[in-house]
């Protein structure tokens, strides 16, 4: 899927603001995911899932940094996320539906932290972008 120049600009602009807060944004998105969809906790039984835990901050940061990697390689997301796709499909065996749930939690978190920047156009671009990221992550499940 290709992105228009306006979509690329919206994604890059917001990523510029998010990139300095990856652990916080990621932890909050994961907390939101786990509160809204408790069944997603099953993959994290070895984590301390309490509010603000080191585990949530660390893993949340990794998630958001991976999204940042995709954002900075927006013209070749499959290559940028290839190793991560392998990990989720072959080792972790995460339910593919969880990526859509996490994408929603991330968008809500972005909207809360960056209300002026996360306008309708930015939301549409990020929704499309995260859908592509999710599709890439589940592409090796087949």
Swiss-Prot record:
One of its GO terms (molecular function) is heme binding. Red blood cells. InterPro entries: Globin (IPR000971), Globin-like_sf (IPR009050), Globin/Proto (IPR012292), Hemoglobin_a-typ (IPR002338), Hemoglobin_oxygen_transport (IPR050056), Hemoglobin_pi (IPR002339). O2 binds at residue 59. Heme b binds at residue 88. One of its GO terms (biological process) is hydrogen peroxide catabolic process. GO terms for cellular component: blood microparticle; haptoglobin-hemoglobin complex; hemoglobin complex. Keywords: Heme, Iron, Metal-binding, Oxygen transport, Transport. Residues 2-142 form the Globin domain. Belongs to the globin family. Heterotetramer of two alpha chains and two beta chains. This is a larval (tadpole) alpha-globin. PANTHER family: HEMOGLOBIN FAMILY MEMBER, HEMOGLOBIN SUBUNIT ZETA. This is Hemoglobin subunit alpha-5. It comes from Xenopus laevis (African clawed frog).
């Amino acid at each position: 899927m290709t992105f228009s120049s306006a979509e690329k600009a919206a994604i890059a602009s917001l990523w510029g603001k998010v990139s300095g807060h990856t652990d916080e944004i990621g932890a909050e998105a994961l907390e939101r995911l786990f509160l809204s969809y408790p069944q997603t906790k099953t993959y994290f039984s070895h984590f301390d899932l309490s509010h603000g835990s080191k585990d949530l901050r660390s893993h949340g940061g990794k998630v958001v940094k991976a999204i940042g990697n995709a954002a900075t390689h927006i013209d070749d997301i499959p290559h940028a996320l290839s190793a991560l796709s392998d990990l989720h499909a072959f080792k972790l065996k995460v339910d593919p539906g969880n990526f859509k749930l996490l994408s929603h939690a991330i968008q809500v978190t972005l909207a809360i932290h960056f209300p002026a920047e996360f306008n309708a156009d930015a939301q549409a671009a990020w929704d499309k972008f995260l859908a592509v990221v999710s599709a890439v992550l589940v592409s090796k499940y087949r």
